Amino acid sequence: MRYELIIYWSRADEAFVVEVPELPGCMADGSSYEEAVANAQVVIHEWMETARELGRPIPEPRGKLAYA
């Protein structure tokens, strides 16, 4: 599944931050853009695995692609 990723630089954290708005609380960071996106893929997998274990629904991706 392909979820929307919001990626931005955080001056406070001095890192790139990735938010996955379709998966509540799903965030990752990294010292580079590429590392942040790779970390987000791991966190998305873990988020979905935890949701399955708890019997919670996993939202379908909205399918919107946008550049900001």
Features from the language model and the residues they span:
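Short, charged, surface-exposed hinge/linker loops at domain edges
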Residues: 1-6, 13, 38-68
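Short aromatic-glycine-(Arg/Gly/Cys) micro-motifs in beta-strand/loop hairpins
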Residues: 8-23
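Hydrophobic residues in alpha-helical membrane-spanning segments
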Residues: 22-25, 60
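A short, exposed loop/beta-hairpin motif centered on an aromatic-Gly-Thr core
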Residues: 24-35
